[in-house]
Amino acid sequence: NIANASPIADMPPLLMILDASVVLRKGKERREIGLQDFYLSYKKTVLRESEFIESIRIPKIEHGHLVRVYKVSKRFEDDISASCGAIWMTTENGKIKRAHIAFGGMSEIPKRALNCEKALEGLAWNEETIKLGMEAVRNDFSPITDFRATKEYRLQVSQNLLLRYFHELNNPSANPVRIASHA
């Protein structure tokens, strides 16, 4: 899910917003690189010949931080994402102190939405600010159209996931509950 460099892998967006790094190993040699620097281009990584991912390091986050991951696909189970988003924001005194946002399926590699993050940080935690972030996402990605989704759909989904995150955190009792009829 990480080493094959698929742009629609589910784990990389989450690991990116958590500032995870990968420990790469070849024989006895090891090196550590941030996951957001691991991907170079479509299906290309910084992995050298005979090197492999030995481990993933995730910094500890403080209790109470709310991270959300969303997978959007045509089918409920066993499907490859049309888009996958991971969002983690921290607030202080009613303002967004830190925004970490990443998407898969929005470009040739999974990546952070850096323009969106910058547009949100320091502003009030409200729907108007989130809508500014939704517009800023347009500057982060140039999605493609393929058999899973159109580029317009992918862009709209990424914007809607930001708004969904805001509403879920503002109204925790409204969080959806999914009940499956199987184990």
Where are the predicted features?
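C-terminal structural segment of proteins
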Residues: 1-183
